[in-house]
Structure formats: C-alpha cells, structure tokens
Swiss-Prot record:
Function: Anaerobic nitric oxide reductase; uses NADH to detoxify nitric oxide (NO), protecting several 4Fe-4S NO-sensitive enzymes. Has at least 2 reductase partners, only one of which (NorW, flavorubredoxin reductase) has been identified. NO probably binds to the di-iron center; electrons enter from the NorW at rubredoxin and are transferred sequentially to the FMN center and the di-iron center. Also able to function as an aerobic oxygen reductase.
List of residues binding Fe cation 2: D83, D166, H227
Protein name listed in UniProt: Anaerobic nitric oxide reductase flavorubredoxin
GO cellular component: cytoplasm
Chain sites annotated for binding Fe cation 1: H79, E81, H147, D166
C-alpha cells in the first residue's frame, strides 16, 4: 500500500515491525524500523531507493500495483547499503536497462553487493541536476561519511522535499508516516538513540554538510528520510537538533556503567552514585549493569553525559569482557568533550582498573582519578567510594554547586580546622587508598590526629604495601 507524501510523491516502502537487530547485532531496534522508498510521478517517473533485501519480492510486487515497472524512467540510489538498495537485483531483473543515478562510490558498493557491473550507472556529484518534467528537477548533494562514503541526498524542486538518506532518520516503525502523527516522546528518543549510536563518529562532518545544503538557499517543506518518519511539521526542527548534537553535546548528566563477578563492583557503583548526588543534587545520575542492560541505551546515555564512570571486576588480571567490548564501542564512536573515571574491585590482583583507565584515555576521554577496592568493600571502603563520588561531582560540575552543599563543605572544613590543623589527606598514587590524619592508621600504630608530616618514614600503604613516597596530596585539597 502506498501513501501520498505530497502531490505526486508516494511512499512505497516497507515497515518491519519485528526486526530487533541492525548492523548484525550492534544496534537493537526495539521499536522496529522502516525502509522508505519513494515514487515520484511527473513527466518522468523516478524511484528513490528500494528496501531491505529480505523484502525484495514483496517490494517489487507492491511496486507493480502502483506503476508498470517499464514506466520507471530513473532509479536514484542515495545509499548502497542493503537496507536501502537491497531489492535492486529483484527489480533490475524486470527492467535491466533503467538508468541508475548514484555517486561514484555507490557504484563500487552496489557492484560489491549485487555483482552486476553491466547495469546502466550514471554518476552524479554535488550540484548536478536531473530534469523530470513539469518544471521540476532533482538536485543531488554528496554527503560522504554520513554515514558511508557513497551517501548522498536528493532534493526535489517545486515540492521542496529533501530525500535525506540516513540523516534525520530513526529506527522507528509506526502505521503513521508523518512526524506530527506519532508519539513525540518516542520519536525524540529514537532520533537521539539513532544519532548517538550511528552518526556520533561523524559529528565533525554534520555541521559543515548541513551548512553546505543550507547554502543552496532552497526551501525545505518536507524531509523524507530512509528510516522512520517523514518530517512535514516544522521539518527543520530535526536539523536544529543535529546541529546541537554535533557540537560536542553534553547534558548535566553522569553515567555509571559496570560489570561485576561477586556484586562488589556494584556496591562501589551505588556508593559512588550516592556521593555524586549528595554533593550535586542537580546532576542526573544513571547506573547500568552492562551485562543486563541495552547496550545502545548505555551508549546514548554516555552521549548525553558530561562524564562516565566505568567499573569492572578483575578477571585473569584484565577487565570483564563485556566492559572491554563496551569500551571498544565507545572508542569507535569517538565521543568528545567528556570525562571518565575507572573503578573496580579485585582480590589478589587489581590489573583491570589500570587497563581500563588506559583504554578510556585512548578512547579520547579526559581522565579523572581511578578507584580500587579489595575484596568486598566494607563500610570504610564504601565511604571512600562515596567520597570519590563527591570529588567527581566537584571536578565535573558544569556550574557552581548549590549553596547548601557548599555551606556543608565549608562547615565541615571549619569544624575540622577548629579541632586541629592536621593538614591534608594523602592519597596513594598506585591504589588510591587515602590517609586521613583525623583517623590515622591504628594497624601501624599511627594514632588519630597524626598529620602526614609526622607519620613514620617506614609507613606502608595498607592496600598495596608501598611507602610514603608514592603518596600525593588528595587532589580536592591541593591548593
């Protein structure tokens, strides 16, 4: 069944309610998807894109119900991926001489998938036009790496419709086609999920390409995407969102993600979150167990966040496999303007947190101090986790902290100073254990109230057994 998009433009695509995996299993399409193909009937008849290859026969049969296939004058392929051009082999078997208009890179991709170099390919570049009669033209705009090298958009003059390919789309299936007909909350969530998981690596290209398209000074009454809705009500709203998301986007949000073997790292995650919320009640904190959560939801939250804390147990001296996989995904997505911190629990060896810190730094995150706990964290260890969360909240604050929080901190510091000027707390640079002069270290006969300067030179860190020379003044107390 076709749907009128505008005037002589009809949607002839395919809804896919049951699809749950995309790009292999890398993208969970929890709300299905659609493969949008468009038939333009002017003096010349034009088909823009096809559908996913698994619907090839249905697509060609449905298209026959709309038009004699021999009457299709041109085929435009904006993108050669199988969910866009998958039905070409089935269609071209019926009309083998029909001209195909696409980019030079698309020819390589189409031949790689369909193996028909004899098809009638016509290469187009940015600014090229194709007259389709009735005073209307198609204008082509190359958009390489949004998100494949072959990608392009097509603009129809007269009707002012931009066929935008993957840009501005979403994996979202609904019986309604237009953006003003569907649930707006669901639509926004799927748009952001789509951008975060698919287009984030190419954010540096989004703004200049949108600027280039706007530079044509062409009116845009509708944006017809390759997946999801057609934007007819205020279509530029999604363009404005893309410009916002492309500009090193972040919200006042922190994501905590972890995997755990014996629940110990989960306990750390909860305590860190408590410390963050206690110090900065305005910040949104979301916690995910990577083994039990939707990976794409996690990555969308990282995209939205100003920072991410990643936790892992140590297994065979390395991080948990699902955490390693998630960090590899984050490396590929090339997030920008975000901070990170690693944490985790261990038994006899704690190598995972160090490896995790290195991997996060390699992924482009600005790193903060990491945190380790040995075995199951006791109340003292959990308090260290809360303090770590408090320090993260202070370091990552986007604005001055609420006055009530500041006053509490000042009062505590004033009270401590009144009791005795014990000097700063010191942190082991290897394992992050903290020496608090107010508590001392009774196990080594260091009495409460002992400043660091008076701690014996033979003092050893209770966690890693290294000496005083590896201790530094706690960052939050450094002047």
């Amino acid at each position: 069944m076709s749907i009128v998009v505008k005037n002589n433009i009809h949607w002839v695509g395919q809804r896919d309610w049951e699809v749950r995996d995309f790009h292999g299993t890398e993208y969970k399409t929890l709300r299905g998807s659609s493969y949008n193909s468009y038939l333009i009937r002017e003096e010349k008849n034009v088909l823009i894109d096809t559908v996913d290859h698994k619907f090839s026969r249905e697509f060609v049969q449905n298209l026959r119900n709309e038009i004699d296939l021999a009457d299709i004058d041109y085929i435009v392929i904006n993108h050669a991926e199988e969910d866009h051009a998958g039905a070409l082999t089935e269609l071209m078997a019926q009309i083998p001489d029909t001209p195909i208009y696409c980019t030079a890179n698309a020819i390589d991709s189409i031949n790689g998938h369909h193996h028909h170099p004899e098809w009638n390919f016509n290469v187009v570049k940015t600014g090229d036009t194709l007259d389709i009669g009735n005073g209307k033209q198609l204008i082509f705009v190359e958009t390489p790496m949004l998100h494949w090298p072959d990608s392009m958009m097509t603009y129809l003059t007269g009707d002012a419709v931009l066929f935008s390919n993957d840009a501005f789309g979403q994996h979202y299936c609904d019986e309604h086609l237009f953006n003003d007909e569907v649930d707006q909350t669901e639509l926004f969530e799927q748009c952001q999920r789509y951008y975060a998981n698919i287009l984030t690596p190419f954010s540096r290209l989004v703004t200049p390409k949108i600027t280039e398209i706007l530079g044509f000074n062409l009116p845009v009454d509708m944006i017809a995407t390759s997946h999801g809705v057609v934007w007819r009500d205020n279509p530029t709203q999604i363009v404005e969102l893309y410009l916002k998301w492309a500009a090193d986007y972040q919200e006042d949000r922190i994501t905590i993600v972890y995997d755990t073997m014996s629940n110990n790292t989960r306990m750390m995650a909860d305590a860190i979150a408590q410390g963050i919320a206690e110090t900065d009640p305005r910040v949104a904190v979301k916690i995910f167990n990577v083994a039990r959560s939707d990976k794409n939801e996690i990555l969308t939250n990282v995209f939205r966040s100003k920072g991410v804390l990643v936790g892992t147990s140590t297994m065979n001296n390395v991080m948990m496999p699902k955490i390693a996989g998630l960090v590899e995904e984050m490396t590929g997505l090339r997030f920008r303007n975000k901070r990170a911190s690693a944490f985790g629990s261990h038994g006899w060896s704690g190598g995972a947190v160090d490896r995790l810190s290195t991997r996060l730094q390699d992924a482009g995150f600005e790193m903060s101090l990491s945190l380790k706990a040995k075995w199951r964290p006791d109340q003292d260890a959990l308090e260290l986790c809360r303090e770590h969360g408090r320090e993260i909240a202070r370091q990552w604050a986007l604005a001055p902290l609420p006055q009530s929080t500041v006053n509490t901190v000042v009062e505590e510091e004033t009270s401590a100073a009144t009791t005795a000027d014990l000097g700063p707390r010191m942190q082991c640079s290897v394992c992050q254990w903290i020496y608090d002069p107010a508590k001392g270290e009774p196990m080594q006969d260091v009495a409460p109230g002992t400043p660091w300067s008076e701690v014996p030179d033979n003092f050893l860190c209770p966690e890693c057994s290294l000496g005083k020379d590896v201790f530094d003044e706690l960052a939050s107390e450094a002047k």
